[in-house]
């Protein structure tokens, strides 16, 4: 069984019930999530040995965060305990033409104030096959950039493949800061994951004839984006998710996977989604892609599985994608009817 290690911040998610706005709500839902943790949950649900690494306080909220991963079979034994705060994000779900709003309260969280010496990466990567992180994690501060760098170096020394989802977050750092840090970290990466605008935000690489906010994407233009990324950093594969946003409820959803050694550009089928919760949609794609590549799927099958997994996640409340391999394969195989199973 393949072993995957992911590293990042696990946050407390506070969200008004239903589609209420922050200014009107009296109660919030209390759950947990975070980019790399979401990927670990997906992989554990697919039967893989997935470990999540972070730093969390040793108090009850920190333990609740750990328990949220344990219930899905994620290995939490490598989580460092210490610090005072669990990072929080407040999520206001959008509806119709009103977009969702995310407000961060993560300053001085345990992982943001972590030191490189907190993590024994040689021990962490014993027996590991794959390492995954996202661009959200180094955005937490220069110390976390250094932690990510040390993790990547150790992962390479242990023979791991490394994947990174660029995941640009403008509320955490500037484009210039992102470009400097991610240019350094991407030299270690084998599989790069981006959405339709991350490559532009981080590296200034964009698809021609594309109107992201108008919901119109030139899919062919993303071949050039993938090739430019691969040429710049020597990636083995580049995956780009393609979201056509018509409203907060209705999106077109597909992806492209560029296999450099085979010079293959494979596009998935497109799903017309009616969204229940889009948070974690990209992470569920990443989890599906890692599973597919570790399972030996070819380029087309890999991107189809990853997109189908993510399409299902958009129907599930919360950050985590609680689906199984047979459920994903059923959708990827063409059964998207949503009919009741008896």
Q: Where are these predicted regions, by residue range?
A:
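Short catalytic helix/loop segments, enriched in acidic residues and glycine
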Residues: 21-39
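Alpha-helix C-terminal capping segments
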Residues: 31, 39-49, 292-295
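Positively charged, low-complexity intrinsically disordered leader regions
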Residues: 1-21
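Conserved phosphate/ATP/ADP-binding segment of small-molecule kinases
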Residues: 172-261
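Conserved post-catalytic alpha-helical subdomain immediately downstream of the catalytic base
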Residues: 265-335
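Histidine-anchored nucleotide/phosphate-binding helix
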Residues: 35-45, 148-154
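Conserved N-terminal subdomain of the carbohydrate kinase-like
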Residues: 49-136, 328-342
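A short helix->loop->beta-strand "cap" motif at the edges of active sites that frequently abuts
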Residues: 154-161, 233-236
């Amino acid at each position: 069984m393949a072993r995957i290690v992911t590293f990042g911040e696990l946050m407390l998610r506070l969200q008004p019930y239903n589609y209420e706005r922050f200014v009107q709500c009296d109660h919030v839902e209390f759950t947990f999530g975070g980019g790399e943790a979401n990927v670990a949950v997906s992989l554990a649900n697919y039967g893989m040995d997935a470990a999540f690494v972070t730093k969390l306080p040793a108090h009850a909220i920190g333990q609740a965060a750990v328990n949220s991963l344990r219930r899905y079979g994620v290995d939490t034994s490598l989580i460092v305990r210490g610090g005072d705060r669990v990072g929080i994000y407040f999520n206001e779900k959008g509806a119709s033409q009103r977009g969702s709003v995310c407000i961060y309260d993560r300053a001085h969280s345990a992982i943001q104030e972590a030191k490189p010496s907190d993590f024994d990466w040689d021990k962490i990567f014993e027996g590991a096959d794959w390492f995954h992180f996202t661009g959200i994690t180094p955005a937490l501060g220069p110390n976390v950039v250094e932690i990510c760098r040390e993790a990547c170096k150790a992962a390479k020394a242990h023979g791991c493949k490394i994947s990174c989802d660029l995941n640009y977050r403008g509320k955490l750092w500037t484009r210039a800061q992102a470009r400097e840090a991610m240019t350094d970290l991407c030299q270690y990466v084998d599989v790069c994951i981006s959405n339709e605008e991350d490559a532009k935000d981080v590296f200034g690489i964009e698809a021609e004839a594309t109107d992201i906010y108008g919901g119109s994407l030139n899919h062919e233009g993303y071949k050039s984006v993938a090739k430019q990324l691969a040429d710049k950093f020597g990636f083995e594969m580049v995956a780009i998710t393609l979201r056509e946003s018509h409203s907060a409820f209705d999106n077109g959803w597909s992806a492209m996977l560029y296999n450099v050694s085979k010079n293959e550009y494979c596009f998935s089928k497109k799903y017309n989604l009616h969204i229940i919760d889009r948070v974690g949609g990209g992470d569920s794609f990443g989890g599906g892609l890692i599973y597919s590549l570790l399972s030996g799927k070819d380029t087309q099958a890999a991107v189809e599985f990853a997109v189908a997994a993510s399409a299902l996640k958009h129907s599930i409340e919360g950050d985590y994608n609680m689906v199984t391999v047979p459920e994903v394969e059923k959708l990827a195989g063409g059964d998207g009817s949503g009919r009741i199973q008896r």
